[in-house]
């Protein structure tokens, strides 16, 4: 089984590219979605996050309010590190459980924001970086409902995209049309599934 990392900065279109790979036949796992699923009541991560950050992060129904949690951790490096420690430990266990059950000829892709920053890209056979310039990323994030301030804060926590592409085995330029992006994705998919 080939294990591929897929990353890029906020607003660059990682999820769009991941969906294209999924449609072509890859098994794609979205790290953010998986981590968000850990926040449901009863999950050990939920318990540990509430114990660590307090009940102030909960909404009226007792669910973790991700916006409240983000407001806390993105303003304090130590708290962010603690949250990542809790969630990433569970994430890696889950990835191992999932990949153990996949067939040998599966193209497994993990979509995750911080593969380069955390050094975990080294655990994968190849790294794909989705690229789009700052202004395009900002516009996309704001269109999705993110505030400009929140975008800036998150953008600054990530390695500059121009630096991140230096780690890539493949770069998908997602600043053009959907058709242009799809052509690049298809080419990369064909290369990854052709090579032994």
Curated annotation (Swiss-Prot):
Give the encoding gene's name: coaE
GO molecular function annotation: ATP binding; dephospho-CoA kinase activity
Question: Could you tell me the Gene Ontology terms of the biological process aspect for this record?
Answer: coenzyme A biosynthetic process
Task: From the Swiss-Prot or TrEMBL record, state where the protein is found.
Answer: Cytoplasm
* Keywords tagged on the record: ATP-binding, Coenzyme A biosynthesis, Cytoplasm, Kinase, Nucleotide-binding, Transferase
Q: Which HAMAP family match?
A: Dephospho_CoA_kinase
> From what organism does this protein derive?
Aquifex aeolicus (strain VF5)
Q: Write down the EC number.
A: 2.7.1.24
Where mainly found?
cytoplasm
Residue ranges occupied by any DPCK domain in the UniProt entry? 3-196
Protein name as it appears in the record: Dephospho-CoA kinase
Q: Which Pfam families match?
A: CoaE
Q: What does this protein do?
A: Catalyzes the phosphorylation of the 3'-hydroxyl group of dephosphocoenzyme A to form coenzyme A.
Q: Which family does it belong to?
A: Belongs to the CoaE family.
Query: Record's InterPro entries?
Result: Depp_CoAkinase (IPR001977), P-loop_NTPase (IPR027417)
Q: List the disulfide bonds.
A: none
Q: Which SUPFAM superfamilies match?
A: P-loop containing nucleoside triphosphate hydrolases
Reactions catalysed: 3'-dephospho-CoA + ATP = ADP + CoA + H(+)
What cellular component GO annotations does this protein have?
A: cytoplasm
Q: Which residues bind ATP?
A: 11-16
List the pathway annotation: Cofactor biosynthesis; coenzyme A biosynthesis; CoA from (R)-pantothenate: step 5/5
